[in-house]
Amino acid sequence: MGFRHKDIIALKDLTKEEITLLLDTADSLSEINQRDIKKVPTLRGKTVINLFYEASTRTRTSFEIAAKRLSADAVNITASTSSVVKGETLSDTANNLLAMKPDIIVMRHAVSGAHEYLAKRVSCSVINAGDGAHEHPSQGLLDMLTMRQKFGKLDGLKVAIIGDITHSRVARSDIYGLTTMGSHVFLAGPPTMMPVGIERLGNVTVCKDMREAVDKADVVMMLRIQLERQGKTLLPSMREYSRYFGLNPEVLGLAKKNAIVMHPGPINRGVELASSVADCDQSAILTQVENGVAVRMAMLYHVCGGEPVE
Protein backbone atom coordinates (compact mmCIF):
# COMPACT_ATOMS: atom_id res chain seq x y z
CA MET A 1 0.00 0.00 0.00
CA GLY A 2 1.32 3.42 -0.94
CA PHE A 3 0.88 6.62 1.04
CA ARG A 4 -1.92 8.68 -0.52
CA HIS A 5 -1.37 12.02 1.24
CA LYS A 6 0.59 15.00 -0.09
CA ASP A 7 0.72 16.45 3.42
CA ILE A 8 0.78 15.16 6.99
CA ILE A 9 -1.27 17.60 9.04
CA ALA A 10 -2.97 15.47 11.70
CA LEU A 11 -3.11 11.85 12.85
CA LYS A 12 -6.90 12.05 12.92
CA ASP A 13 -6.70 12.13 9.10
CA LEU A 14 -4.78 8.83 8.86
CA THR A 15 -6.14 5.30 8.78
CA LYS A 16 -4.81 2.37 10.79
CA GLU A 17 -3.11 1.07 7.65
CA GLU A 18 -1.42 4.41 6.94
CA ILE A 19 -0.15 4.75 10.51
CA THR A 20 1.15 1.17 10.34
CA LEU A 21 2.93 1.97 7.07
CA LEU A 22 4.66 4.99 8.61
CA LEU A 23 5.70 2.99 11.69
CA ASP A 24 6.95 0.06 9.58
CA THR A 25 8.95 2.44 7.40
CA ALA A 26 10.43 4.14 10.47
CA ASP A 27 11.44 0.73 11.82
CA SER A 28 13.20 -0.06 8.54
CA LEU A 29 14.92 3.33 8.30
CA SER A 30 16.09 3.22 11.92
CA GLU A 31 18.86 0.86 10.85
CA ILE A 32 20.48 3.76 8.98
CA ASN A 33 20.88 5.61 12.27
CA GLN A 34 23.03 2.78 13.66
CA ARG A 35 25.58 2.86 10.82
CA ASP A 36 28.99 4.49 10.96
CA ILE A 37 28.02 6.54 7.88
CA LYS A 38 24.43 7.57 8.55
CA LYS A 39 23.40 8.62 5.06
CA VAL A 40 21.47 7.21 2.09
CA PRO A 41 20.70 8.89 -1.26
CA THR A 42 16.92 8.39 -1.06
CA LEU A 43 15.92 12.08 -1.20
CA ARG A 44 18.96 13.47 -3.00
CA GLY A 45 17.97 16.60 -4.90
CA LYS A 46 14.99 17.33 -2.64
CA THR A 47 14.79 20.50 -0.52
CA VAL A 48 13.20 20.59 2.93
CA ILE A 49 12.46 23.93 4.62
CA ASN A 50 12.01 23.83 8.39
CA LEU A 51 9.88 26.89 9.18
CA PHE A 52 9.52 27.32 12.94
CA TYR A 53 7.42 30.09 14.48
CA GLU A 54 7.87 28.60 17.97
CA ALA A 55 10.88 27.44 19.95
CA SER A 56 12.00 23.84 19.48
CA THR A 57 15.00 21.68 20.29
CA ARG A 58 14.10 18.04 19.62
CA THR A 59 11.60 18.45 16.77
CA ARG A 60 13.51 20.93 14.63
CA THR A 61 16.86 19.22 15.15
CA SER A 62 15.51 15.76 14.37
CA PHE A 63 13.68 16.94 11.23
CA GLU A 64 16.95 18.50 10.04
CA ILE A 65 18.91 15.34 10.83
CA ALA A 66 16.20 13.21 9.19
CA ALA A 67 16.37 15.23 5.97
CA LYS A 68 20.17 15.13 5.84
CA ARG A 69 20.33 11.38 6.50
CA LEU A 70 18.11 10.92 3.44
CA SER A 71 20.47 13.28 1.51
CA ALA A 72 17.93 16.09 1.16
CA ASP A 73 19.01 19.72 1.49
CA ALA A 74 17.65 21.15 4.75
CA VAL A 75 17.10 24.88 5.30
CA ASN A 76 16.13 26.16 8.76
CA ILE A 77 14.11 29.35 9.27
CA THR A 78 13.00 30.70 12.65
CA ALA A 79 10.47 33.50 13.04
CA SER A 80 12.89 35.63 15.06
CA THR A 81 15.39 35.73 12.18
CA SER A 82 12.91 36.00 9.30
CA SER A 83 10.76 38.73 7.75
CA VAL A 84 7.96 37.73 10.14
CA VAL A 85 9.43 40.21 12.62
CA LYS A 86 8.93 42.88 9.94
CA GLY A 87 5.23 42.09 9.68
CA GLU A 88 5.19 39.57 6.83
CA THR A 89 2.07 37.37 6.82
CA LEU A 90 2.11 33.58 6.66
CA SER A 91 0.57 33.77 3.19
CA ASP A 92 3.33 36.06 1.89
CA THR A 93 6.02 33.96 3.56
CA ALA A 94 4.57 30.85 1.92
CA ASN A 95 4.44 32.46 -1.53
CA ASN A 96 8.04 33.62 -1.28
CA LEU A 97 9.28 30.24 -0.09
CA LEU A 98 7.30 28.48 -2.81
CA ALA A 99 8.99 30.66 -5.43
CA MET A 100 12.27 28.99 -4.37
CA LYS A 101 10.82 25.56 -5.33
CA PRO A 102 11.08 23.54 -2.10
CA ASP A 103 9.71 20.00 -2.04
CA ILE A 104 8.58 19.98 1.60
CA ILE A 105 7.82 22.66 4.18
CA VAL A 106 7.95 21.44 7.78
CA MET A 107 6.26 24.07 9.94
CA ARG A 108 5.60 24.72 13.61
CA HIS A 109 3.11 27.49 14.36
CA ALA A 110 1.34 28.86 17.43
CA VAL A 111 -2.03 29.01 15.68
CA SER A 112 -4.12 25.85 15.40
CA GLY A 113 -5.04 25.20 11.78
CA ALA A 114 -2.14 27.16 10.29
CA HIS A 115 -0.92 24.09 8.42
CA GLU A 116 -4.25 23.46 6.72
CA TYR A 117 -4.21 27.10 5.61
CA LEU A 118 -0.67 26.71 4.28
CA ALA A 119 -1.28 23.37 2.55
CA LYS A 120 -4.14 24.86 0.52
CA ARG A 121 -1.86 27.60 -0.79
CA VAL A 122 1.31 25.75 -1.75
CA SER A 123 1.97 22.97 -4.24
CA CYS A 124 4.75 21.37 -2.20
CA SER A 125 4.15 19.00 0.70
CA VAL A 126 3.47 20.35 4.20
CA ILE A 127 4.29 18.49 7.42
CA ASN A 128 2.90 19.68 10.72
CA ALA A 129 5.60 19.98 13.40
CA GLY A 130 3.04 21.27 15.91
CA ASP A 131 0.21 23.80 15.61
CA GLY A 132 -1.07 25.50 18.73
CA ALA A 133 -2.93 23.04 20.95
CA HIS A 134 -4.23 21.13 17.90
CA GLU A 135 -1.84 18.31 16.91
CA HIS A 136 1.79 17.18 16.79
CA PRO A 137 1.67 14.16 14.46
CA SER A 138 5.38 13.31 14.40
CA GLN A 139 5.42 13.15 18.21
CA GLY A 140 2.37 10.90 18.17
CA LEU A 141 4.03 8.58 15.67
CA LEU A 142 7.32 8.36 17.56
CA ASP A 143 5.41 7.68 20.77
CA MET A 144 3.55 4.81 19.10
CA LEU A 145 6.77 3.45 17.60
CA THR A 146 8.39 3.44 21.05
CA MET A 147 5.42 1.57 22.54
CA ARG A 148 5.28 -0.93 19.68
CA GLN A 149 8.98 -1.69 20.00
CA LYS A 150 8.55 -2.41 23.71
CA PHE A 151 5.33 -4.46 23.60
CA GLY A 152 5.26 -5.74 20.02
CA LYS A 153 1.80 -4.27 19.49
CA LEU A 154 -0.45 -1.27 20.16
CA ASP A 155 -3.79 -3.05 20.18
CA GLY A 156 -5.06 -3.63 23.71
CA LEU A 157 -2.49 -1.48 25.52
CA LYS A 158 -3.57 0.66 28.47
CA VAL A 159 -1.93 4.06 28.07
CA ALA A 160 -2.22 6.65 30.85
CA ILE A 161 -1.68 10.28 29.83
CA ILE A 162 -1.31 12.63 32.78
CA GLY A 163 -1.16 16.42 32.96
CA ASP A 164 -2.27 19.47 31.01
CA ILE A 165 -4.51 17.80 28.44
CA THR A 166 -6.33 20.98 27.36
CA HIS A 167 -3.26 22.77 26.05
CA SER A 168 -1.33 19.72 24.80
CA ARG A 169 -1.13 19.02 21.08
CA VAL A 170 0.85 15.89 21.96
CA ALA A 171 -2.09 14.53 23.95
CA ARG A 172 -4.44 14.97 20.99
CA SER A 173 -2.13 13.30 18.49
CA ASP A 174 -1.47 10.44 20.91
CA ILE A 175 -5.20 9.99 21.52
CA TYR A 176 -6.06 9.99 17.81
CA GLY A 177 -3.22 7.65 16.91
CA LEU A 178 -3.49 5.23 19.82
CA THR A 179 -7.26 4.82 19.66
CA THR A 180 -7.06 4.25 15.90
CA MET A 181 -4.53 1.49 16.60
CA GLY A 182 -6.69 -0.16 19.27
CA SER A 183 -5.21 1.15 22.51
CA HIS A 184 -7.32 2.35 25.46
CA VAL A 185 -6.29 5.80 26.69
CA PHE A 186 -6.85 6.88 30.29
CA LEU A 187 -6.54 10.60 31.09
CA ALA A 188 -5.96 12.39 34.38
CA GLY A 189 -5.22 16.02 35.20
CA PRO A 190 -6.59 19.06 37.00
CA PRO A 191 -10.23 19.78 36.05
CA THR A 192 -9.11 23.19 34.73
CA MET A 193 -6.81 21.37 32.27
CA MET A 194 -9.21 18.66 31.07
CA PRO A 195 -11.25 19.49 27.95
CA VAL A 196 -14.98 18.87 28.15
CA GLY A 197 -16.08 15.98 25.95
CA ILE A 198 -12.61 14.66 25.15
CA GLU A 199 -13.96 11.12 25.58
CA ARG A 200 -15.61 11.57 22.19
CA LEU A 201 -12.21 11.39 20.46
CA GLY A 202 -12.14 7.60 20.74
CA ASN A 203 -11.58 4.84 23.30
CA VAL A 204 -10.82 7.36 26.06
CA THR A 205 -11.60 7.29 29.78
CA VAL A 206 -11.25 10.39 31.97
CA CYS A 207 -10.21 9.44 35.52
CA LYS A 208 -10.93 11.35 38.70
CA ASP A 209 -7.38 10.97 39.96
CA MET A 210 -3.96 10.02 38.68
CA ARG A 211 -3.74 6.73 40.55
CA GLU A 212 -6.82 5.39 38.81
CA ALA A 213 -5.29 6.18 35.42
CA VAL A 214 -1.88 4.67 36.25
CA ASP A 215 -3.28 1.49 37.83
CA LYS A 216 -2.18 -1.51 35.73
CA ALA A 217 -1.09 0.76 32.86
CA ASP A 218 1.35 -0.46 30.21
CA VAL A 219 2.50 3.08 29.47
CA VAL A 220 2.54 6.19 31.64
CA MET A 221 2.88 9.35 29.54
CA MET A 222 3.58 12.52 31.52
CA LEU A 223 2.95 16.00 30.11
CA ARG A 224 4.33 19.30 31.29
CA ILE A 225 2.10 22.26 32.15
CA GLN A 226 1.84 24.45 29.04
CA LEU A 227 2.21 27.80 30.79
CA GLU A 228 2.89 29.58 27.49
CA ARG A 229 -0.61 28.63 26.21
CA GLN A 230 -2.53 29.60 29.33
CA GLY A 231 -4.10 33.02 29.44
CA LYS A 232 -4.47 32.87 33.21
CA THR A 233 -3.21 30.88 36.16
CA LEU A 234 -5.06 27.58 36.36
CA LEU A 235 -3.28 26.16 39.42
CA PRO A 236 -2.82 27.29 43.04
CA SER A 237 0.86 26.28 42.94
CA MET A 238 3.35 23.97 41.25
CA ARG A 239 3.88 22.22 44.56
CA GLU A 240 0.19 21.30 44.78
CA TYR A 241 0.19 20.17 41.15
CA SER A 242 3.18 17.91 41.79
CA ARG A 243 1.50 16.47 44.86
CA TYR A 244 -1.57 15.30 42.94
CA PHE A 245 -0.28 14.83 39.39
CA GLY A 246 3.46 14.24 39.69
CA LEU A 247 4.85 10.78 38.92
CA ASN A 248 7.04 9.39 41.68
CA PRO A 249 8.22 5.82 42.37
CA GLU A 250 5.23 5.09 44.61
CA VAL A 251 2.64 6.01 41.97
CA LEU A 252 4.63 4.28 39.21
CA GLY A 253 4.42 1.13 41.33
CA LEU A 254 0.69 0.97 40.53
CA ALA A 255 1.44 0.38 36.85
CA LYS A 256 2.38 -3.01 35.43
CA LYS A 257 5.86 -4.23 36.36
CA ASN A 258 7.02 -3.95 32.74
CA ALA A 259 5.39 -0.54 32.18
CA ILE A 260 7.38 2.24 30.53
CA VAL A 261 7.48 5.93 31.40
CA MET A 262 7.33 8.46 28.57
CA HIS A 263 7.48 12.24 28.20
CA PRO A 264 7.55 14.38 25.03
CA GLY A 265 9.95 16.88 26.62
CA PRO A 266 11.06 19.24 27.86
CA ILE A 267 10.79 17.74 31.34
CA ASN A 268 10.13 19.87 34.39
CA ARG A 269 11.90 17.70 36.95
CA GLY A 270 10.28 17.74 40.34
CA VAL A 271 6.98 18.97 38.93
CA GLU A 272 5.31 16.37 36.69
CA LEU A 273 8.15 13.89 36.95
CA ALA A 274 10.55 13.00 39.76
CA SER A 275 14.17 12.74 38.64
CA SER A 276 14.35 9.24 40.09
CA VAL A 277 11.58 8.18 37.68
CA ALA A 278 12.87 10.13 34.67
CA ASP A 279 16.21 8.34 34.98
CA CYS A 280 14.98 4.88 36.03
CA ASP A 281 15.23 1.67 33.98
CA GLN A 282 11.56 1.96 33.00
CA SER A 283 12.09 5.36 31.39
CA ALA A 284 11.80 5.34 27.60
CA ILE A 285 12.27 9.09 27.22
CA LEU A 286 15.59 8.98 25.38
CA THR A 287 14.29 6.12 23.22
CA GLN A 288 11.50 8.48 22.16
CA VAL A 289 14.09 11.06 21.10
CA GLU A 290 16.04 8.42 19.17
CA ASN A 291 12.90 7.19 17.43
CA GLY A 292 12.02 10.74 16.48
CA VAL A 293 14.70 10.79 13.80
CA ALA A 294 13.50 7.54 12.19
CA VAL A 295 9.84 8.59 12.28
CA ARG A 296 10.59 11.94 10.68
CA MET A 297 12.68 10.22 8.02
CA ALA A 298 9.63 8.07 7.26
CA MET A 299 7.35 11.11 7.05
CA LEU A 300 9.67 12.93 4.66
CA TYR A 301 10.10 9.78 2.59
CA HIS A 302 6.40 9.10 2.13
CA VAL A 303 5.22 12.63 1.34
CA CYS A 304 7.84 12.57 -1.41
CA GLY A 305 6.10 9.54 -2.90
CA GLY A 306 8.30 6.80 -1.50
CA GLU A 307 7.17 3.20 -1.80
CA PRO A 308 7.01 0.88 1.24
CA VAL A 309 10.49 0.01 2.49
CA GLU A 310 11.23 -3.73 2.57
From Swiss-Prot:
SUPFAM superfamilies reported for this sequence: Aspartate/ornithine carbamoyltransferase (SSF53671)
Metabolic or biological pathway: Pyrimidine metabolism; UMP biosynthesis via de novo pathway; (S)-dihydroorotate from bicarbonate: step 2/3
InterPro entries per record: Asp/Orn_carbamoyltranf_P-bd, Asp/Orn_carbamoylTrfase, Asp/Orn_carbamoylTrfase_sf, Asp_carbamoyltransf, Asp_carbamoyltransf_Asp/Orn-bd
Catalytic activity: carbamoyl phosphate + L-aspartate = N-carbamoyl-L-aspartate + phosphate + H(+)
Binding locations of L-aspartate: K86, R169, R224
Keywords: Pyrimidine biosynthesis, Transferase
Tagged with keyword Transferase: yes
Keyword flag Secreted: no
Gene Ontology annotations for the cellular component aspect, listed alphabetically: cytosol
Enzyme Commission code(s) on record: 2.1.3.2
GO terms of biological process kind: 'de novo' pyrimidine nucleobase biosynthetic process; 'de novo' UMP biosynthetic process; amino acid metabolic process
Purpose of the protein: Catalyzes the condensation of carbamoyl phosphate and aspartate to form carbamoyl aspartate and inorganic phosphate, the committed step in the de novo pyrimidine nucleotide biosynthesis pathway.
Name of the protein in question: Aspartate carbamoyltransferase catalytic subunit
Organism: Citrifermentans bemidjiense (strain ATCC BAA-1014 / DSM 16622 / JCM 12645 / Bem)
Recorded name of the encoding gene: pyrB
